[in-house]
Amino acid sequence: GVDIEAGERAVDRMKAHVAATRRPEVLGGLGGFAGFFDASALGKYRHPVLATSTDGVGTKVAIAQAMDVHDTIGFDLVGMLVDDLVVVGAEPWFVTDYIACGRVDPNRIANVVKGIAAACAKAGCSLLGGETAEHPGLLAPEEYDVAGATTGAVEYDEILGPQRVQEGDALLAVASSGLHSNGYSLVRKVLLADAGWTLDRHVDELGRTLGEELLEPTTVYASDLLALVRQVEVHAMSHVTGGGLANNLARVLPDDLVATVDRSTWTPAPIFTLVQQVGDVSQPDIEATLNMGVGMVVVMPEANISEAIEVLAGRGLSAWQCGHVSRRGGPDEPGAVLVSSHSRS
């Protein structure tokens, strides 16, 4: 059966983490049937629009379980959530999480929530509530999965997206911290299943163990990109997740424009070339699966690129101009293309 007492102990251990994310608009505390967020915060907007996003972390959770390291996977979850929200210009207000597990281990669950709370604090949003569901018989005792949702708001006439993008705009790449939370099924197949590598294997090219590299937390860009939008004119942003750089970039362009990304403007981190070489993965396949070192792309007037790079550098993010937007040849042409070859470090 379900261990009610273990669930209660897990809630007790996560309360301090949740409290650390509290925004002034949050009403009440943890443990009620619903979380409350004071909607009068919408009063500061002329025409408020709510934005919401739901996501998970895919099979990266299998690495966390194998390594018995559980706080980073919660951080990953929030990165996947709030950075899908910020690309439309929305400020994330709160996150709710869902953890399904075979058996409630209070320490493990509290560590997952610790990571969620840390990323919420980084993004400036509250962890408003969540659910921990014990599923004995469906999941093994050590197994769990995490998912969540986030809600925020944006001024109607400040929504970013295809309607703002113009011919002649420049593309600003913002570096990823590594794989982030996409492509782990491919990575696990290539390096663990096929090559027979172990997570405790020290990999010289990486300068650390394989497991440490694979658990590198997803970058949470939200507060930094919102700061950028407040200082520099931005037309659209693309969160590079499942599907890779070209596919995600095409989603934020109008039908009559194409984004051309120049690979020679950056060198992917060693983990990307390692997966490609060890697995003999083709360039199209690797680029359609992994972010290749770019976590975000900002579409903006070329005149503002230098200022944007400076703003992001001041916030600890590496960024560079990686391409441009031009007229699309026809409806059958792709919305984004990658050209040239990556420079070698």
Regions found by a protein language model. Give the residues of each.
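Glycine-/charge-enriched secondary-structure boundary and capping motifs
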Residues: G1, A16, R108-S126, L139-V146, ...
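N-terminal amphipathic/basic leader segments beginning at the initiator methionine
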Residues: G1-E25
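Short, acidic Gly/Pro/Ser/Thr-rich loop/turn segments
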Residues: G7, G43-Y45, V57-K60, E155-E158, ...
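Hydrophobic face of alpha-helices
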Residues: V11, A110-V113, Y184
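Glycine-rich phosphate/pyrophosphate-binding loop regions near the starts of catalytic domains
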Residues: A16-S177
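Short, acidic (Asp/Glu-rich) active-site segment that either coordinates a divalent metal cofactor
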Residues: T54, D145, E158-L210, A246
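A generic alpha-helix surface/boundary motif
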Residues: D76, S185, A269-P270
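Short loop/turn motifs at secondary-structure junctions
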Residues: G89-E91, L186, E233, S318
